[in-house]
Amino acid sequence: MNRKHLANAIRALSMDGVQQANSGHPGAPMGMADIAEVLWRSHLNHNPANPEWADRDRFILSNGHGSMLIYSLLHLSGYELSIDDLKNFRQLHSKTPGHPEYGYAPGVETTTGPLGQGITNAVGMAMAEKALAAQFNKEGHDIVDHFTYTFMGDGCLMEGISHEACSLAGTLGLGKLIAFWDDNGISIDGEVEGWFSDDTPKRFEAYGWHVIPAVDGHDSDAINAAIEAAKADPRPTLICTKTIIGFGSPNKQGTHDCHGAPLGADEIKAAKAQLGWEHGAFEIPQEVYAEWDAKETGAAKEASWNEKFAAYEAAYPELAAEFTRRVNGDLPKEWEEKASAIIADLQANPANIASRKASQNALEAFGAMLPEFMGGSADLAPSNLTMWSGSKSLEANDFSGNYIHYGVREFGMTAIMNGIALHGGFVPYGATFLMFMEYARNAMRMAALMKVQNIQVYTHDSIGLGEDGPTHQPVEQIASLRLTPNMSTWRPCDQVESAVAWKLAIERKDGPSALIFSRQNLAQQERDAKQLANIAKGGYILKDCEGQPELILIATGSEVELAIEAAAQLTAEGKAVRVVSMPSTDAFDKQDEAYREAVLPSAVTKRIAIEAGIADFWYKYVGFGGKIIGMTTFGESAPADELFKMFGFTTENVVNTAKELLA
């Protein structure tokens, strides 16, 4: 059957889906349909019956607004995505949301839509493939051997994150990464030459990529030849495909009119006539389905891989078991027992150290049990303390390590980590100063939205970093992380809480964790076994009084020590004071009402929250009748001790505030 006719099935479904929803983006799917047909029918190794097959090729639609393209491909190829699902495009609770979302339609590898993040996720997936291959493949046993393909448009390339990711991809020689640039010259505002005149091929050549320029995106033979050349090259490849947006639409193709709006019934009729597509809305002939159906070939490809893995398992049984454990996302059998023993040992052996150092110690203790760790930092390893004795850096010619030097690329790092997590086989952690999570915020939000494991180490957590001043001193960042749905945020007060935070982040498979650590040393707190167990609940009674407290001090991180000192002084003056350490408000909020009431009795309304971050967040816990010792402005450049005094983080101020409240 004519390849163009098979590609027209994508065009027809895309036009019909957008028209039915009365919103969407038909232009990109219609423009990239020929490329998609060649890639999916002649090159992509996948099995519609098992979208989780470990050695499948990955396909990422970075220009996610063109979502009807991937939905059409999945439907036509035989995934569990029905024609009714396509008719429900952009409708409530459908499997076909406006932008592709991970966890809805089987075969969607990542959530895309915020431009540039899809190509960056793809870089992460390609890194994971190369690292897994280096760690597990043996001579004659290539059990990890797949490509990562991504489609991207002009918008992805305009976004700065594409520079961060593609630069690193070239440096690390990700030869299994193949990107298709949809060079159609059109964006929402019109012809892009007025705001995007880069020499994109030269840009990617400068990154160290293999660039295939000037490929006719509507010539199947040229597309096929480009893919073959890309697969044969040891470098990442950019295939520059010149396309016509809205291809087939006689009155709108090549213009921004078909970018982000339905074509309209009359134009769809005219387009189908021009394309020679003689079928009604959402009608696909059986002979077209037969040509597209990948179930039989996909099952055969996976069966062939299963035979390869069986041979590998016979030759390397321990490695095979470890590979299976890691791609399934399971922790080692001895994890719980050993990790809990490490935490108990820390409590029994006090140390007054910075929580960033406590974090490094936790990595040292836990890392030996977790070969799936894939660490990194945005050029701050000596400050974030993210390297441990078992860390080995990834290099272009040696990917057997477990540590990525991301360079100064916070946004790229975080979205790459999403790709690594989505690929499977690794537990990724990255790091920067808490202030610079602002560069990476949207990628962390995407991790929360997708419910993927992404552990971020954010150090230098307050005005406590001192002389670098307000450009580097976070104020509102902790609160913003706490306000992000499905984000788990921890700000520990000592080495014990730090280790607990790490343990829980490692165990959490349904979302990201932000671990927030100090630059300055923190005193270790005394705890009994019950208090030690209650750290995991996010908030617990660290110091109590006889009977009902008349005042509760709630603190996190470096301010817990301050609360303990103030409570001791107030207790000596006859006040009944309770101190609650609350390293994770989201973990505390998940506890049952009885536990929360036991820690923060509703009858005790005199409460003070103490945190060197934005004050307003804490009204949820202290009520309007309570007091908050926090930040209401940006910081200053000065030694940390002077800043804490200036902003009221002193025992004297806590005591005086308490007395005012109790008066």
Swiss-Prot record:
Binding site for thiamine diphosphate: H65, G113, P114, L115, G155, N184, H259, F436
UniProt GO molecular function: metal ion binding; transketolase activity
GO annotation (BP), single: pentose-phosphate shunt
Known cofactor(s): Mg(2+); Ca(2+); Mn(2+); Co(2+)
One GO cellular component term: cytosol
InterPro entries linked to this entry: THDP-binding, Transketo_C/PFOR_II, Transketolase-like_C_2, Transketolase-like_Pyr-bd, Transketolase_bac-like, Transketolase_BS, Transketolase_CS, Transketolase_fam
Catalytic activity: D-sedoheptulose 7-phosphate + D-glyceraldehyde 3-phosphate = aldehydo-D-ribose 5-phosphate + D-xylulose 5-phosphate
Top enzyme category: transferase
Residues annotated as binding Mg(2+): D154, N184, I186
E.C. number: 2.2.1.1
Gene3D superfamilies assigned to the protein according to its UniProt record, in alphabetical order: 3.40.50.920, 3.40.50.970
Keywords assigned by UniProt, alphabetized: Calcium, Magnesium, Metal-binding, Thiamine pyrophosphate, Transferase
Record-linked PROSITE patterns: TRANSKETOLASE_1 (PS00801), TRANSKETOLASE_2 (PS00802)
Domain of life (superkingdom): Bacteria
Annotated binding of substrate, by residue: H25, H259, R356, S383, H460, D468, R519
Site (Important for catalytic activity): H25, H259
Catalytic machinery residues: E410
Binding note for cofactor: Binds 1 Mg(2+) ion per subunit. Can also utilize other divalent metal cations, such as Ca(2+), Mn(2+) and Co(2+).
Subunit structure: Homodimer.
Family: Belongs to the transketolase family.
NCBIfam families given in the database record: tktlase_bact
Role, per record: Catalyzes the transfer of a two-carbon ketol group from a ketose donor to an aldose acceptor, via a covalent intermediate with the cofactor thiamine pyrophosphate.
Name by which UniProt lists this protein: Transketolase 2
The species this protein was found in: Aliivibrio fischeri (strain ATCC 700601 / ES114) (Vibrio fischeri)
